[in-house]
Amino acid sequence: GHPRPGAVSLAHNGVLFLDEASEVAAPVLDGLRAPLEEGHVRLARSRREVTYPARFQLVMAANPCRCAAEDPSKCRCNPHERMNYLSNLSGPLRDRLDMVVTLTGQAATINAEGEEESAVIAERVAAARERAAARWWADGITARTNGEVPSSYLRRKRPAAEAAMVMLSAYLADGEISQRGVDRVLKL
């Protein structure tokens, strides 16, 4: 039959949330690399190729290990099991993630008091995107978000502070970050 858009294309201009990402097969996760980089997904079926838009923000959640113990001292997994549990998240995929945040059980607890309504947050996000689009439009760039701006343009026309570049260069030289990682930091 005719190829149909999947989750990646349906998340176009939005968020693709993968819960329990470490449980997703490695080839599936690695299949996200091209759409994250190129902003589209290409499907080839029966001597026919279809391209669907796929510019999305990827958000993944994963426990640090299979037992998911809230208190690390109560974890039943050995170090090898913990390392293997997150091995589905390949280096090249991690390299395409803008941020990686580790939450402790206490930090992950949601405090309902003072919590904002989703509609209020959505309005702030929409306003921020409008400001970003106007800023880039003034520079002749057709981008709605910082993530869509070509890295070469950012390095040339909107360089980061010298102290930040010195730090990023040191991380790059030590192999703690890749050039793609440096570009991602500049876009943040």
Where do the protein language model's features map onto the residues?
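Thr-Gly-centered strand-to-loop micro-motif
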Residues: 18-19, 43
